[in-house]
Amino acid sequence: MATYETQGFKLNDSGRRIIVDPVTRIEGHMRCEVNLDANNVIRNAVSTGTMWRGLEVILKRADPADAWAFVERICRVCTGCHALASVRAVEDALGIKIPKNAHLIREMMAKTLQVHDHVVHFYHLHALDWVDVVSALNADPKRTSALQQTVSPAHPLSSPGYFRDVQIRLKKFVESGQLGPFMNGYWGNPAYKLPPEANLMAVTHYLEALDLQKEWVKIHTIFGGKNPHPNYLVGGMPCVDSNLDGSGAAGAPLNMERLNFVRARIEEAIEFVKNVYLPDVLAIGTIYKDAGWLYGGGLSALNVMDYGTYPRVNYDPTTDQLPGGAILNGNWDEIFPVDPRDPEQVQEFVAHSWYKYADETKGLHPWDGVTEPNFVLGPKAVGTPTDIKQLDEDAKYSWIKVAALAGHAMEVGPLVALHPRIRARAEDPKSYRAHYLREQVENSARAINTGIPQALGLKQTDYTVKQLLPTTIGRTLARALEAQYCGNMMLDDWHEMMANIKAGDLTTANVDKWEPSAWPKEAKGVGHVAAPRGACGHWIRIKDGKIENYQCVVPTTWNGSPRDSKGQIGAFEASLMNTPMAKPEEPVEILRTVHSFDPCLACSTHVIRPDGQERVVVKVR
């Protein structure tokens, strides 16, 4: 590779190589290799998806109405989002419009996933990159209680005795030597910056979130029959409004008792995000900011995009409550419109991916996409195909294709909607709750700069939003803010559906085009959703009533992209650049930033290779 510059980053692979394989606490299988300079600063990063995508091949010649049930199995963590993208793609192709109740039910299910996924991601997948669990044993429960009441006075579980009980439980757990989910942590690493009391508070909330998350997904069970993998339907939703005046007789698919249960779970989630999740992220972010840890921005200040979602009025994108658009080349003053139908915008490339195109210098729009595997190691790779010691990033090195927007490597995810110019688009009068995004960001910046530092005796700062957001901390904060926003929107959806039902509209599906005989001979469509990890799109071509071609371009396809033919690096790789490491043999910093994207390799590449390793190997070369 030698040394070269791209997207404002200077890459140099001459330093020693650190290999993390697999990256754990994600969905799927991922490998990461970085090169360090003499000061242990990352100067080159190589992100690899080590699973192969095969679902598009499986779907060929299948019934389009069944596609959602196949693609939903891509991942059980971001469950439902692929099904929703799929039914939207088919409906778009066939010209099907869904009823209002179906739209509102889909909205509530999608937002339930956002809240649930962000909470589970932070506490159970990502928090351990910020929180030293063993350090919590040294905490003073009284001081922990005081900290809790400072950062979140409204949370009722905050007494010294409560934290002491959790600490005793944790102590027994640690002393048993069977740490379970806390096994193999790099406890004591100097990259951890929280005081013991903050660690105890976070571990306590880890346990609280574990209890609550299983209740929230019952919303999916009520509307979709089960979780994971709730049921969807081309043309609407399979649930039926009946017995709405009853108390919930056995066998009633949807009734007032169950609808009131949904409202209770929504309100419960709103309170937890407001009083626990968001305060924890703000407190942790403030302490790490105080330690100078504002790394991990990568492409987030340069190139970001989203399609836009959550329309207040279905089929009217001007009412999107999370607006779409793109920022390119770091120009925060201009929004580039994103059109998933434009063959010159969304394209996939395979120059450095283990796939084959007729002309690998060119990208393909998903409607014309090809998924043909071509697993070959580059000439500078070390090892064998079943025991790779080191990859050759000058050649093919990932099962993830390169997703690009108008030729640009992009970052997607919750951070996108918080960029000032994109956020400003939500302030259109048609976009309900639009002002809320601006208030969220401004209040969070004040809390991190002055509010929490003043309460904790830390140095106050005056970082701008443009300095705080494009960081690992900012990316983590964005998930919490999106969870808060989605919870509030979900309650609006519930009230709107109840009003619609009371007005006499009980329709949940449009089956006018259920029979293939009502379809055109050929059709194509696209469906997109805001998955917890960002922009998720499904493209379909239908011919003679069967799927002719199907392509998914999912969030981790964007963020996990390898290099393209021009040498541009993807969002994962860019985010690791210039990050200092305290102890390279314990890569906390790599995990912290990669986890901030909530990678889902199961989504971006769909079939695990049979020789996939099962234990974490960290190699320093």
UniProtKB/Swiss-Prot annotation:
It is a peripheral membrane protein. Its main location: membrane. Its cofactor is Ni(2+). Its EC number is 1.12.99.6. It catalyses: H2 + A = AH2. Gene3D superfamilies: Cytochrome-c3 Hydrogenase, chain B. Ni(2+) binds at C75, C78, C600, C603. PROSITE patterns: NI_HGENASE_L_1, NI_HGENASE_L_2. GO terms for molecular function: ferredoxin hydrogenase activity; hydrogenase (acceptor) activity; nickel cation binding. The keyword Metal-binding applies. The keyword Oxidoreductase applies. It is an enzyme of class 1 (oxidoreductase). InterPro entries: Ni-dep_hyd_lsu, Ni-dep_hyd_lsu_Ni_BS, NiFe-Hase_large, NiFe/NiFeSe_hydrgnase_LSU. Heterodimer of a large and a small subunit. Belongs to the [NiFe]/[NiFeSe] hydrogenase large subunit family. This is Uptake hydrogenase large subunit.
